[in-house]
Design a protein with these regions (language model features):
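Helix-coil boundary and interhelical linker segments in multi-pass alpha-helical membrane proteins
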Residues: 1-7, 75-80, 122-132, 256-269
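Alpha-helical transmembrane segments in multi-pass membrane proteins
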Residues: 9-16, 46-54, 58, 62, ...
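Interfacial segments of multi-pass membrane proteins
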Residues: 31-40, 113-127, 254-262
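Membrane-interface alpha-helices at helix entry/exit sites of multi-pass transporters
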Residues: 36-49, 82, 132, 136, ...
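Intrinsically disordered, low-complexity non-transmembrane regions of multi-pass membrane transporters
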Residues: 160-234
Length: 308
């Protein structure tokens, strides 16, 4: 049951969930859009489905994250209240939504950690549990990008060599199309240069000029079809895993509210957070999508799959 004391916390959590969806939902499928595997709308639809599924599954898979991001152990015991929880949600959500409006991919976990830290400092700067901050928050945030970079440095060359060994090659394309051509027959004035005449042009294209495909077969399946299918599945798994990770962090604000009395995780809290995340992604993902998919680097299908 939603009470008046819980309402500010609920609004703060939903605000944060909306912001999270707007900034994060598309990240997992950005390689699909950037490589041309799927259109923006198709990629967004796939991201939304995977996000909803991950949010619902998080009820069983991510209980420890609920405890971590409820402020227990970081904020001095007995000082956490509904007003503080609402402020944490609104502050973190506003930070993420501002970055989204600017088209900047950001981390909800970083924003939420900063909001929790700010609340702890306001309540009692001398009572902050710095060991908890370092071990449960700072350490994972610092190590995860380095781990991802290290893995891709090892994985991409290995997969590239495997592709070549299997006889799967990138194919060039021959672009043939009608194009205007200038003609100046004998006895015609120079003014005729401005009169276009139809003609044919032929050019050999590569990734920058036309779509790259993979030639060959893998386990009896067309290589390009296999790469695209695996790419789509990998992008969905990224969105699913992110939702499993992020939903409990946001729901923790609701579950820590005194109005809930520290009860077990209610299904309605997860459902509301999941719906808000999905709605935020559907309505406000475009700017972050363009940044991730178009402005950072060019990716082909294989590179997108490897990145995921």
């Amino acid at each position: 049951m939603i009470t008046w004391t819980l309402l500010p916390v609920l609004l703060g959590a939903l605000w944060l969930a909306w912001s999270n969806g707007a900034n994060d939902n598309f990240k997992g499928v950005s390689t699909l859009y950037g490589s041309g595997t799927l259109s923006y709308r198709a990629a967004l639809a796939w991201a939304t489905v995977a996000t909803l599924a991950g949010s619902l599954v998080s009820v069983w898979l991510a209980q420890s994250l609920v405890q971590t991001f409820s402020g227990n152990g970081l904020i001095p015991a007995g000082t956490l209240n509904d007003a503080m929880l609402a402020a944490i949600g609104i502050g973190a959500g506003t930070t993420v939504l501002l970055a989204t409006w600017l088209g900047m991919p950001t981390s909800t976990t970083h924003a939420l950690t900063g909001a929790l830290m700010g609340a702890a400092l306001v309540v009692d700067s001398g009572g902050v549990n710095w060991a908890t901050l370092a071990n449960n928050f700072a350490q994972p945030l610092l190590l995860s990008p380095l781990l991802a970079i290290g893995l891709i440095l090892l994985l991409y060359p290995a997969l590239h060599r495997l592709r070549l060994r299997l006889g799967i090659r990138e194919t060039s394309c021959l672009c043939v199309g009608e194009t205007p051509a200038s003609a100046l027959p004998a006895g015609v004035s120079a003014a005729a240069l401005s009169m276009p005449a139809p003609g044919l042009s032929v050019a050999v294209g590569d990734l920058s000029g036309c779509a790259t495909r993979y030639g060959g077969r893998f386990i009896g399946v067309d290589a390009h079809t296999a790469v695209n299918a695996l790419h789509v599945l990998s992008a969905g798994s990224v969105c699913f895993a992110r939702a499993v990770n992020d939903t409990p962090k946001i729901a923790a604000l609701l579950l820590a509210a005194t109005a809930l009395g520290g009860q077990a995780q209610p299904a309605w809290a997860i459902a509301l957070i999941a719906l808000a995340m999905a709605a935020g992604g559907l309505i406000q993902s475009r700017r972050v999508a363009e940044t991730l998919s178009r402005r950072i680097t060019d990716l082909n299908h294989g590179q997108g799959l490897t990145a995921n």
